[in-house]
Amino acid sequence: KSEGRHSTENIDIVPKEGGSGLDIYVKPFTKNENVHIPALITQDGVSEVVYNDFHIGEGAEIEIIAGCGIHNCGCDDSVHEGIHRFFLGKNSKVVYIEKHIGEGDGSGKRIINPQTHVEAEENAYIEMDTVQLKGVDSTKRVSSAKLGPGATIVIKEKIMTHGHQTAE
């Protein structure tokens, strides 16, 4: 359940019709703005799939900050599957920062399975800096990209696990 959204003159955040997630539209040539897309699960037994699509206009330069935290003190697993798709217009530039964390002293697992898919037009650039901080029992990360001429994707990924935690 979404608790709130804030659009600006250049960035429109729209809930998906008939589904879970958002469409984020960034107007062409938008500069020096940022978008925050947090997710938080505070109950055990929750399983959600969220689809967020970022439509970045030509020549736009923005920063997107996203992430999920699961606080699970119960005995049933909690799962967040965030599927983010980026549609980058010609000559656009995106810095995408994503952080995940799990906590809680229950026996239920904290599972986060992110997917990131990029379609970049000519000379578009996206830098993805993703971090899994701690406490996530299981994660399966999937990334894909379809790049136009001169387009660039840079992926920096840090995943911290301990004990019986797994990451793929």
Show the residue positions of the predicted features.
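Conserved beta-strand/loop scaffold segments within soluble protein domains that form the structured core
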Residues: 6-168
